[in-house]
């Protein structure tokens, strides 16, 4: 390549042109120059426009007639060629006497191929548009799955500065990858097969679009203080173009790749010396999404069915190295052992009891829904790459399964339980609902037995019992085996083997050799074996990767087995040669031997039977007892179980303002209590308090009764908590209009409104980390305004402000002819915990009046500020109802 002129002259050979196999490699660059310009992905090679976008001068007399003739011939020949291509398959069918079915099959195949190709190009183009202008894509409104993570999740931070750094480095990364493909990958492919001697990369171009990190989430709670955990929302919508050629007529390539996933980066252990981090560990929590646009002969991979198979094969290759439980570890210090970081012990085991479901939607309808049938439901349960499918219950909308499954949980937080329900059909299974449960809350509560409502469907819920099993190195915690339930877990870290025989002729075991030679004949050879390990415990068998051409193989893999009976089960291991299918060594280890070892662990070299005299295999075998531990006292009922213990009583403040309020309210309450004492149930404030506050609050209430309150009264009213205008301004300026909204609904000057408060509503609020949603429980109301001679027909309406859309409206059932209704109804708002703290609940109590009735409609409302309380712990309070929702004082 000619050296570039410092004066800015045009180089003789433009950069980025396709490389021919016989062309020399150009490695020299102008001193101090940056990355050389490349051809655009779809541009013509060797042609460049002058600076400023102006075209060069053209002589109108040169080639004008020739170009016009060429355009005319092209316009006539293109329709003719298209007609010939369309009719040629018809001619072939008639020429060879094939059935017209083959023609129809080819037509449908071509239609599906073009449809799949069009959709894939549309997805890539949409991703490129979002890459070019992310702000425009967010403001104009895209689907949630297309938006960056920082838009949907407030706890995910936007790191645009990091994307700018990657974008600045991307051309140089492209140069390195291009050189690596040509200098390393190409010779390896050529040497792998005699048919690939002419294999050549004709073009390697990573494109202009670089991988982006849409957000970073850091974990600071419930994690080890000696590590830093980051989740990177990785998104690559690349215009990469790679073309290969084996022979002149055999060309293939890739033009456009999409890769999306959550990459977890762990910096651990933290050290007091440089470089302060012992190692960097990276892995994908879930299998990433991959979409490849093939070109050339590989276009056949775009055929429906084949495309899914090819993409899944590539994802499987990525998963074997970078998806849990596999990890990629880069040691940064000699003080740490990389093997311990690559294969840490699992966090625990989740035992899931799939009990039943109810109120599922019917999918087997007939005559376009005129005749409604039922469904044949089954459940698919998933944590990471572990999948289980339940049995199918025929024609039942309230199926009962009664099945149990066990999952190995490697990362918490990070991994979630996914439950999908489907209706089994001969052609395509119909969707019945889904459910995602975060495992952090299960790990805190230890045992969760709950009905979970299904998402994305009008109705349906599933009953699950979740048990978190800790891994304990204590043999005394070992329980008896019963009912197929696992009592322990065996983790095997397969390291390496040494002094393996090349074949079965090198060791003397006449019985084993004679048994094998009855069915096979081996050829004695001095070639080193391609060895792999086959391990089994009970009915489960696993196979390691194959190490080629070595008598000292190194596998470096980990496997886990569930153990039902430690005293009866064995670990059986066999080293085999994949090429000759002969055994190179065996090991049988009774598991009860591990019970006498320290921490139930054996880390040593085990001698192999039926092998060479010095053949050994190095493994670390860890036995852990599965046990449900009691929850920690400070975390009792902080997960999904927190609302099961009823409301927590709140101590009233000893202020003069509350005293005067208590006097006026007590008189009003006693007047209603004498009238309705025989019909009103005991208020929910009298229910059993939570375990964590029972003793303390019982002693406080018995020794220091609140003033103006009868200790024997059942209608004690805790302090009402209502928001002030100051937090209202902090949440959002748009919420300042709530006062005007309330004024338009309620008329404060209406003489029908009493001067004191107009009743109370009891609300329980908690953020469910399992469901990642805000749970609001409307318990009851009391002392409501009488709207007619029969009392009122009250119901409660809820908004999560500032959202006042009809779709976000929640409403309880109507209670007839009562001023003290009991609801006990639960509602959920899908919102993150950080976002929930910025919101406010609008709870209004209304009277269900008939059409044309002149009865009162609004009974009062309250605005609940969610930023003042710990939402994870939750709270239950009585709130006074006012016309505007603001406090009366």
From Swiss-Prot:
GO terms for biological process: endoplasmic reticulum-plasma membrane tethering; lipid transport. Ca(2+) 1 binds at residues 363-364, 423, 425, 430. Residues 17-28, 41-58 have a biased composition (Basic and acidic residues). InterPro entries: C2_dom, C2_domain_sf, C2C_KIAA1228, Ext_Synaptotagmin_C2A, Ext_Synaptotagmin_C2B, Extended_Synaptotagmin, SMP_LBD, Synaptotagmin_SMP. Residues 658-671 have a biased composition (Basic residues). Its main location: membrane. Residues 804-811 are annotated as: Required for phosphatidylinositol 4,5-bisphosphate-dependent location at the cell membrane. It is a peripheral membrane protein; Multi-pass membrane protein. CDD domains: C2A_C2C_Synaptotagmin_like (cd08391), C2B_Synaptotagmin-like (cd04050), C2C_KIAA1228 (cd04030), SMP_ESyt3 (cd21681). The chain crosses the membrane at residues 67-91, 92-112. Residues 672-682, 691-714 have a biased composition (Low complexity). Ca(2+) 2 binds at residues 364, 376, 423-425. The keyword Electron transport does not apply. The keyword Cell membrane applies. Residues 155-333 form the SMP-LTD domain. Keywords: Calcium, Cell membrane, Endoplasmic reticulum, Lipid transport, Lipid-binding, Membrane, Metal-binding, Repeat, Transmembrane, Transmembrane helix, Transport. Signal peptide: none annotated. Residues 1-65, 649-724 are annotated as: Disordered. The SMP-LTD domain is a barrel-like domain that binds glycerophospholipids in its interior. Tethers the endoplasmic reticulum to the cell membrane and promotes the formation of appositions between the endoplasmic reticulum and the cell membrane. Binds glycerophospholipids in a barrel-like domain and may play a role in cellular lipid transport. This is Extended synaptotagmin-3. The lineage of its organism: Eukaryota, Metazoa, Chordata, Craniata, Vertebrata.
């Amino acid at each position: 390549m000619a050296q570039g002129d410092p004066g800015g002259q045009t180089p003789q050979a433009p950069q980025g042109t396709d490389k021919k196999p016989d062309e020399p490699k150009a490695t020299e660059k102008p001193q101090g120059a940056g990355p050389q310009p490349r051809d655009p992905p779809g541009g013509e090679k060797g042609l460049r426009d002058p600076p400023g976008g102006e075209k060069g001068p053209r002589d109108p007399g040169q080639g004008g007639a020739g170009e016009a003739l060429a355009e005319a011939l092209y316009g006539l020949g293109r329709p003719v060629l298209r007609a010939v291509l369309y009719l040629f398959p018809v001619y072939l069918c008639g020429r060879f006497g094939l059935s017209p079915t083959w023609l129809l099959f080819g037509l449908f195949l071509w239609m599906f191929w073009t449809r799949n190709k069009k959709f894939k190009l549309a997805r890539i183009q949409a991703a490129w548009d979002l890459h070019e202008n992310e702000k425009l894509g967010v403001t104009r409104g895209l689907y949630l799955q297309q938006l960056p993570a920082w838009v949907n999740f407030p706890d995910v931070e936007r790191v645009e500065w990091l994307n700018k750094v990657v974008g600045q480095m991307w051309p140089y990364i492209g140069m390195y990858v291009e050189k690596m493909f040509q200098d390393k990958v190409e010779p390896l492919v050529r040497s792998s097969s005699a048919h690939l001697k002419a294999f050549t990369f004709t073009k390697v171009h990573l494109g202009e679009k670089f991988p982006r990190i849409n957000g970073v989430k850091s974990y600071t709670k419930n994690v080890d203080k000696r590590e830093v955990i980051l989740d990177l929302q990785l998104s690559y919508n690349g215009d990469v173009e790679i073309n290969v050629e084996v022979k002149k007529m055999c060309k293939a390539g890739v033009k456009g790749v999409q890769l999306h996933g959550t990459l977890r980066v762990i910096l651990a252990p933290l050290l007091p010396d440089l470089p302060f981090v012992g190692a960097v560990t990276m892995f994908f929590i879930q299998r990433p999404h991959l979409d490849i646009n093939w070109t050339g002969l590989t276009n056949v991979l775009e055929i429906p069915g084949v495309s899914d198979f090819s993409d899944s094969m590539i994802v499987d290759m990525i998963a074997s190295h970078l998806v849990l439980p596999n990890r990629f570890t880069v040691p940064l210090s000699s003080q740490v052992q990389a093997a311990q970081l690559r294969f840490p012990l699992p966090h625990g085991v989740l035992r899931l009891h799939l009990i039943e479901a109810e109120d599922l939607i019917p999918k087997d309808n007939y005559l376009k829904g005129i005749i409604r049938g039922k469904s044949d439901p089954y459940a698919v349960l998933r944590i990471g790459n572990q999948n289980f499918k339940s049995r199918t219950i025929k024609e039942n909308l309230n199926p009962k399964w009664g099945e149990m499954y066990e999952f190995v949980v490697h990362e918490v937080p990070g991994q979630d339980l996914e439950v999908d329900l489907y209706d089994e059909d001969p052609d395509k299974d119909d969707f019945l609902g889904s459910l995602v449960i975060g495992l952090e809350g299960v790990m805190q509560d230890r045992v969760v037995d709950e009905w979970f409502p299904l998402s994305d469907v009008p109705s349906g819920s599933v009953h699950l019992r979740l048990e978190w099993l800790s891994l304990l190195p204590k043999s005394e915690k070992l329980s008896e085996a019963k009912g197929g339930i696992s009592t322990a877990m065996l983790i095997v870290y397969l390291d390496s083997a040494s002094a393996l025989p090349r074949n079965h002729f090198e060791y003397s075991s006449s019985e084993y050799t004679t048994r094998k030679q009855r069915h096979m004949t081996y050829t004695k050879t001095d070639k080193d074996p391609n060895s792999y390990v086959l391990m089994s415990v009970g009915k489960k068998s696993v196979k390691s990767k194959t190490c080629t051409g070595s008598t000292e193989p190194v596998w470096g893999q980990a496997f886990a087995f569930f153990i039902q009976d430690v005293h009866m089960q064995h670990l059986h291991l066999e080293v085999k040669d994949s090429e000759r299918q002969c055994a190179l060594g065996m090991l049988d280890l009774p598991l009860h031997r591990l019970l006498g070892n320290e921490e139930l662990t054996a880390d040593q070299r085990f001698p192999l039977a039926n092998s060479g005299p010095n053949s050994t295999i190095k493994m670390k075998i860890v036995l852990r007892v599965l046990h449900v531990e009691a929850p920690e006292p400070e975390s009792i009922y902080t997960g999904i179980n927190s609302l099961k213990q009823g409301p927590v009583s709140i101590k009233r403040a000893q202020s003069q303002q509350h005293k005067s309020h208590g006097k006026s309210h007590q008189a009003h309450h006693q007047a209603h209590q004498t009238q309705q004492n025989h019909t009103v149930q005991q208020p929910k404030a009298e229910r059993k308090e939570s375990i964590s506050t029972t003793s303390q609050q019982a002693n406080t209430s018995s020794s220091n009764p609140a003033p103006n309150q009868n200790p024997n009264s059942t209608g004690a009213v805790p302090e009402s908590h209502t928001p002030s205008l100051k937090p209202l301004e902090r949440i959002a300026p748009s919420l300042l209009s709530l006062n005007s909204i309330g004024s338009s609904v309620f008329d404060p000057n209406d003489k029908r409104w009493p001067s004191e408060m107009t009743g109370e509503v009891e609300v329980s609020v908690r953020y469910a980390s399992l469901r990642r949603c805000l749970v609001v429980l409307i318990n009851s109301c009391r002392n409501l305004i009488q709207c007619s001679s029969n009392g009122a027909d009250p119901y409660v309406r809820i908004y999560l402000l500032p959202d006042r859309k009809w779709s976000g409206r929640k409403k309880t059932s109507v209670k007839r002819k009562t001023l003290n209704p009991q609801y006990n109804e639960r509602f959920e708002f899908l919102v993150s915990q950080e976002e929930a703290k910025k919101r406010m609940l609008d709870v209004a109590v209304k009277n269900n009046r008939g059409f044309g009735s002149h009865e009162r409609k609004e009974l009062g409302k309250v605005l609940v500020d969610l930023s003042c309380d710990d939402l994870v712990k939750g709270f239950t309070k009585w709130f006074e109802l006012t016309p505007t929702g603001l406090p009366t004082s």
